[in-house]
């Protein structure tokens, strides 16, 4: 009998300025040898059994990965569920009010993982508002495909 693998669902929030610069975090340790850029990502993560909804998961992940909570969750628009990879879908929520640089001044990642040397390090180690023209260089291909189609 063939085993059926269930797709996991991740959820994330898209925050943009009026000029469509996207709030992103730099993924710690993501710069590969010989590559110029680190990988950057939006605040997102797996929807856990303890989450009440995908929106709840997106808000939790945003807080864990960025420490950012200075927004009105009632202004998050559900953009839907997108195929992220063969084993993962991504549900995205868009903050409908443009954000400002100053809003992210005190961001800090509180979500840690153990690196190959056994040291606990934050998932994200820097934050920035990334212009649309740079997305293809800093995003992973799955996120870029989705964001390019949306915006």
Swiss-Prot record:
Pfam families the UniProt entry points to: NUDIX
Protein's UniProt name: Uncharacterized 17.7 kDa protein in e-segB intergenic region
InterPro entries the UniProt entry points to: NUDIX_hydrolase-like_dom_sf, NUDIX_hydrolase_dom
Top-level taxon of the source organism: Viruses
Record organism: Enterobacteria phage T4 (Bacteriophage T4)
Domain Nudix hydrolase: 6-143
Gene name tied to this protein: y06L
Residues passing through the membrane, by range: none
